[in-house]
């Protein structure tokens, strides 16, 4: 049976999300703590909670602390106009970066943020003085966890991996699944259950170009 949804690759590790990707859509709706640096007229009804029996002013006052979806915070952020400033989520602050540098494998990334790497990469958009430390922490965390993830995916044939997978960020889960698929394909090949072997796309494209050159 064909899949109802053709998976589109995430673009969150680049400068912009890919809004044809369900992973990026979900990631862009995660909340980001911000502080307004100027009053925001006529938006109080949208962003401020009403207290019992009180009416909400039409403006969001300067200095208000809000939690906005990532996509909205990115749209409102402007270095020149200083509409809002961003507060780093705890998982990306120095305390947690120290934990990651000590042993990144002890952290349940999915519990802390299911799109840890993608969301962290998008934080670099806000020109924080900690951007260099954040990017380095993201890279070193990924490197520190990658080997264990792939080793587990290659040595867990027909085993229960739910406890391990439950602790992985969404991107890590994708890598784990790729490793599992490769292992399953290899096991099928060893047992003679593989389908007909075909040339890779790279080889086929090379042959097509070579044939075209010969015709010319």
UniProtKB/Swiss-Prot annotation:
Component of the GINS complex which is a heterotetramer of GINS1, GINS2, GINS3 and GINS4. Forms a stable subcomplex with GINS2. GINS complex interacts with DNA primase in vitro. Component of the CMG helicase complex, a hexameric ring of related MCM2-7 subunits stabilized by CDC45 and the tetrameric GINS complex. It is found in: Nucleus; Chromosome. It comes from Pongo abelii (Sumatran orangutan). Required for correct functioning of the GINS complex, a complex that plays an essential role in the initiation of DNA replication, and progression of DNA replication forks. GINS complex is a core component of CDC45-MCM-GINS (CMG) helicase, the molecular machine that unwinds template DNA during replication, and around which the replisome is built. One of its GO terms (biological process) is mitotic DNA replication initiation. Keywords: Chromosome, DNA replication, Nucleus. GO terms for cellular component: CMG complex; GINS complex. InterPro entries: GINS_A, GINS_bundle-like_dom_sf, GINS_Psf3, GINS_Psf3_sf, PSF3_N. It comes from the Eukaryota. SUPFAM superfamilies: GINS helical bundle-like, PriA/YqbF domain. Pfam families: PSF3_N, Sld5. Belongs to the GINS3/PSF3 family. Its main location: nucleus. This is DNA replication complex GINS protein PSF3.
